[in-house]
């Protein structure tokens, strides 16, 4: 089998810039630092960061968010749902660096098949969404783990979102992938995965783990029997 990466386009990639704006992380870091200071001065058992929902009694240390190496452009903690489909990227978000703490990064998306330039098409069609209801996932060891949905920090509930990309259709055209010579090749589109750091539960403790999410749509080829180049 031969794998071909589908032509990248705005709706199948991580939001423009391949990273959450620095302003968002700066604001997040400021809030976490504030939560840490309050946690140190609060009575025992009254820490300001805890898991919401079914595991609301489990405490999460705000220091978990301080390490830059744990950040991923496909994982976002936000107090508001990211836009499902934004017309354009908000220039003020990156240009001025004045994004409010609970704003999310906006990126250009389209519900129809994208065309970069006239006559150019993607081999496979993909769709990208922010997933905010993930409860379980497969970690890098192949084990199913619990994913934390919400974290309460300083009385603000931050939800954990994942930017996932998957194939819209395994066969965008009758013969399989778009633009493939069906006389010599069998083809189909398939969703591929990668691993990102996500906040999960490890026993009764919150911990970062690599979990698998959908991140791309690629074309898989196999040569038809009896055909030679």
Curated annotation (Swiss-Prot):
GO terms for molecular function: growth factor activity; lipid binding; metalloendopeptidase inhibitor activity; nerve growth factor receptor binding. Disulfide bonds join 124-189, 167-217, 177-219. Coiled coil: none annotated. It holds the Pfam family NGF. Keywords: Cleavage on pair of basic residues, Disulfide bond, Endosome, Glycoprotein, Growth factor, Lipid-binding, Metalloenzyme inhibitor, Metalloprotease inhibitor, Protease inhibitor, Secreted, Signal. Glycans are attached at residues 57, 102, 154. Residues 1-6 form the signal peptide. GO terms for biological process: cell surface receptor protein tyrosine kinase signaling pathway; modulation of chemical synaptic transmission; negative regulation of neuron apoptotic process; nerve development; nerve growth factor signaling pathway; neuron projection morphogenesis. It is found in: Secreted; Endosome lumen. Residues 77-112 are annotated as: Disordered. It comes from the Eukaryota. GO terms for cellular component: axon; dendrite; endosome lumen; extracellular space; synaptic vesicle. Residues 7-109 form a propeptide. InterPro entries: Cystine-knot_cytokine, Nerve_growth_factor-like, Nerve_growth_factor-rel, Nerve_growth_factor_bsu, Nerve_growth_factor_bsu_mml, Nerve_growth_factor_CS. PROSITE patterns: NGF_1 (PS00248), NGF_2 (PS50270). A 1-acyl-sn-glycero-3-phospho-(1D-myo-inositol) binds at residues 161, 197. A 1-acyl-sn-glycero-3-phospho-L-serine binds at residue 197. Belongs to the NGF-beta family. Homodimer. The homodimer interacts with a single NTRK1 chain. The homodimer interacts with a single NGFR chain. The NGF dimer interacts with a single SORCS2 chain (via extracellular domain). The NGF precursor (proNGF) binds to a receptor complex formed by SORT1 and NGFR, which leads to NGF endocytosis. Both mature NGF and the immature NGF precursor (proNGF) interact with SORCS2 and with the heterodimer formed by SORCS2 and NGFR (via extracellular domains). The NGF precursor (proNGF) has much higher affinity for SORCS2 than mature NGF. Nerve growth factor is important for the development and maintenance of the sympathetic and sensory nervous systems. Extracellular ligand for the NTRK1 and NGFR receptors, activates cellular signaling cascades to regulate neuronal proliferation, differentiation and survival. The immature NGF precursor (proNGF) functions as a ligand for the heterodimeric receptor formed by SORCS2 and NGFR, and activates cellular signaling cascades that lead to inactivation of RAC1 and/or RAC2, reorganization of the actin cytoskeleton and neuronal growth cone collapse. This is Beta-nerve growth factor.
